[in-house]
């Protein structure tokens, strides 16, 4: 595939001056700088004495929680016992999962069902996938289920009553009554229609009543917007109220080293259907792609989310021998400067969070944690750190101890120099504690609905849906059964939660050591899922390339796998995003602000008047040039 010369993928966004500034605050520079300093002692000001001082061996700091008589005696026996039990339970868990897979393959997926399923898995486009999904629904008799409104997982009587009222008032043009009904029903998960179970009984679509209700709600909101039925003040208050109750949707891209590159396919599938939310968060490897999306318009992304993007991951890191030498010299496999140069393309140079928001209207969030053990995680965005340079936050979010050293966040000063943020405090990989920062997103941006693209290989084994998941129903007993039968699912749940119990014991009793000065106990015990969780299908050989950039062929496969994993979720996402976009459109009608709009006018996130004032004030405050003492 030939790429036009003027394409976005051929541009270079390296800013050498910023790289030189950043280099002054890296661990390697500090070490070399300290070696050049000649330290002396003196008896008095006129009689200096060059004294050979033998440096004392550094001792680890004491932790008051780990002091005591019994702790050092029982710690290692308890940890050995806990790990032994955990290993045994994990072995039984894998055996049960193997039984469930064999049960489904040999008993459920046979004959015509297996043929239709294979065709579904081979679909390359969403239109092709949807056609084959409907054929599979027809084979399993799911069409009859869609026509029957009765279902225990949502309030079908309430939804039916509201749907009838919307149709009646709109056709009779009773606008005051229509507004009263909209005030009641335009809210998150009204009547349970945002329940994932509604989309977990079929391969495509859901209850016809739910689809009719969403379509009617869409028509009513379009009528209010297009016909201007109310005064500007009434309309503004109405859509502010809708937005507060309905909330926003966030796209969360997890970490996972090179596994995170599978997010490219997820993003491509959402982009093709114009369903990328305006609130996006990324951690570790996911932060790199989140930055790419939030610094480009939709037209630019169509040129970038292709296999040829693999060339931008390449960096001069050398072979394994070079990486080993670098590790013994610096304590990390990768060099911060080379990483910064690579990241600059994805972040469109040295854009700050505020500049990226003004350019695309998308809200970028990067999760990082301070390098010390006990400080709380930090979510970097245009509100909390408007002048922070995006690539520095992305590198910090990728800084896994031993792989990349913790780095300071870099901020654009009043004179446009880069200076360290937060007095040079260093940050590292946010996925060690908060891979998916849902609570922070809800607090700062009123996020009520989350789409999580999860690629962390160490937690994939824990994700199992005994009653099916969105777009992937249980085929046993026409969706009314359990995966592997009730006994198989019951054993899976028991063993999984027993493993989690032992992990909690290890963390609560502080049995786990802290290698490289990092608390690793939360790696398995976070919340890794969302309202919708997308799991791209990975390959075992991906572990071999876990710290390597992709080739064009590998990235092509990853894009296809990411899209295939996203296709089953698009109906659910579209039902939510359709209403959310109309609410945003209604809010923007009477607020012609440049903030929150893309430069091409195609996307954007409107904010309340208070949000706009805060953003403008934050963007006008630039830190002064100060020297940070390292």
UniProtKB/Swiss-Prot annotation:
Class of this enzyme: hydrolase
Catalytic residues as annotated in Swiss-Prot or TrEMBL: 284, 429
Name of protein: Triacylglycerol lipase ptl2
Functional description taken from the UniProt entry: Lipid particle-localized triacylglycerol (TAG) lipase. The lipid droplet/particle is a lipid storage compartment which serves as a depot of energy and building blocks for membrane lipid biosynthesis. Involved in the mobilization of the non-polar storage lipids triacylglycerols (TAGs) from lipid particles by hydrolysis of TAGs, releasing and supplying specific fatty acids to the appropriate metabolic pathways.
One Pfam family hit: Patatin
Source species of the chain: Schizosaccharomyces pombe (strain 972 / ATCC 24843)
PANTHER family the UniProt entry points to: NEUROPATHY TARGET ESTERASE/SWISS CHEESE D.MELANOGASTER, TRIACYLGLYCEROL LIPASE PTL2
Main localization, broad class: other
Reaction catalysis annotation: a triacylglycerol + H2O = a diacylglycerol + a fatty acid + H(+)
Enzyme nomenclature, EC number: 3.1.1.3
Assigned keywords, A-Z: Hydrolase, Lipid degradation, Lipid droplet, Lipid metabolism
Record field: transmembrane: none
GO MF annotations in UniProt: triacylglycerol lipase activity
Lineage, opening ranks: Eukaryota, Fungi, Dikarya, Ascomycota, Taphrinomycotina
GO biological process: cellular detoxification; lipid catabolic process; triglyceride mobilization
Compartment(s): Lipid droplet
Residue ranges annotated for the PNPLA domain, each copy included: 251-442
Signal peptide residues on this chain, from the entry's feature table: none
Family: Belongs to the PLPL family.
Residue ranges annotated as motif GXSXG: 282-286
Gene, per the UniProt record: ptl2
InterPro entries for the chain: Acyl_Trfase/lysoPLipase, NTE, PNPLA_dom, Triacylglycerol_lipase_N
Gene Ontology cellular-component terms listed: cytoplasm; lipid droplet
């Amino acid at each position: 595939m030939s790429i036009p010369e003027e394409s976005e993928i051929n541009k270079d966004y390296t800013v050498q001056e910023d790289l030189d500034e950043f280099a002054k605050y890296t661990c390697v520079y500090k070490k070399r700088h300290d070696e050049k300093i000649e330290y002396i002692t003196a008896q008095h000001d006129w009689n200096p004495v060059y004294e050979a001082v033998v440096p004392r061996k550094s001792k680890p700091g004491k932790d008051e929680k780990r002091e005591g008589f019994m702790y050092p005696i029982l710690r290692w026996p308890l940890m050995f016992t806990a790990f032994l039990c955990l290993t045994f339970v994990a072995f039984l868990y894998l055996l049960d999962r193997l039984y469930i897979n064999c049960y489904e393959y040999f008993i459920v997926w046979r004959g015509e069902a297996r043929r239709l399923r294979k065709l579904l898995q081979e679909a390359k486009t969403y239109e092709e996938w949807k056609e084959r999904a409907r054929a599979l629904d027809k084979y399993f008799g799911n069409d009859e289920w869609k026509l029957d409104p009765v279902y225990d997982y949502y309030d079908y009587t309430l939804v039916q009553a509201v749907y009838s009222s919307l149709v009646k008032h709109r056709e009779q043009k009773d606008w005051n009554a229509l507004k009263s009904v909209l005030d009641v029903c335009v809210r998150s998960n009204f009547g349970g229609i945002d329940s994932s179970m509604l989309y977990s009984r079929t391969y495509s679509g859901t209850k016809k009543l739910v689809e009719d209700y969403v379509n009617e709600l869409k028509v009513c909101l379009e009528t209010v917007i297009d016909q201007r039925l109310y005064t500007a003040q009434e309309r503004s208050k109405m859509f502010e109220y809708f937005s507060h109750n309905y909330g926003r949707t966030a796209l969360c891209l997890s970490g996972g080293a090179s596994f995170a590159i599978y997010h490219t396919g997820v993003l491509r599938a959402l982009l093709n259907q114009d369903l990328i939310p305006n609130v996006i968060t990324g951690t570790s490897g996911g932060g790199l792609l989140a930055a790419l999306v939030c610094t480009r318009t939709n037209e630019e992304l169509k040129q970038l989310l292709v296999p040829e993007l693999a060339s931008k991951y390449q960096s001069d890191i050398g072979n394994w021998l070079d990486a080993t030498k670098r590790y013994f010299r610096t304590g990390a496999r990768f060099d911060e400067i080379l990483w910064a140069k690579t990241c600059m393309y994805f972040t469109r140079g040295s854009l700050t969070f505020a500049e990226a928001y003004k350019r695309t209207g998308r809200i970028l969030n990067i999760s990082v944690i301070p390098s010390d053990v006990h400080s709380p995680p930090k979510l970097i965005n245009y509100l909390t750190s408007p002048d922070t340079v995006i690539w520095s936050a992305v590198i910090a979010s990728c800084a896994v101890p031993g792989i990349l050293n913790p780095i300071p966040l870099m901020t654009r000063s009043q004179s446009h120099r880069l200076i360290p943020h937060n007095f040079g405090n260093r940050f590292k990989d946010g996925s060690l504690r908060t891979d998916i920062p849902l609570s922070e997103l809800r607090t700062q941006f009123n996020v009520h609905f989350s789409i999580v693209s999860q690629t962390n290989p160490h937690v994939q084994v824990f994700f199992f849906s005994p009653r099916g998941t969105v777009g992937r129903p249980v085929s046993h007993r026409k969706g009314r059964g359990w995966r592997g039968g009730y006994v198989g699912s019951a054993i899976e749940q028991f063993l999984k939660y027993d493993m989690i119990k032992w992990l909690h014991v290890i963390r609560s009793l502080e049995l786990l050591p802290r290698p490289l000065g990092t608390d690793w106990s939360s790696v398995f015990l976070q919340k890794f899922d969302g309202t919708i969780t997308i799991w791209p299908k990975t390959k075992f050989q991906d572990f071999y390339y876990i710290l390597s950039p992709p080739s064009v062929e590998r990235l092509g496969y990853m894009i296809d796998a990411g899209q295939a994993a996203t296709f089953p979720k698009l109906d659910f996402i579209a039902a939510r995003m359709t209403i959310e976009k109309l609410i945003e459109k209604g809010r923007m009608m009477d607020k012609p602000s440049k903030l929150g709009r893309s430069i091409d006018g195609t996307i954007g996130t409107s904010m309340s008047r208070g949000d706009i004032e805060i953003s403008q004030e934050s963007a006008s405050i630039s830190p002064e040039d100060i020297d940070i003492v390292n």
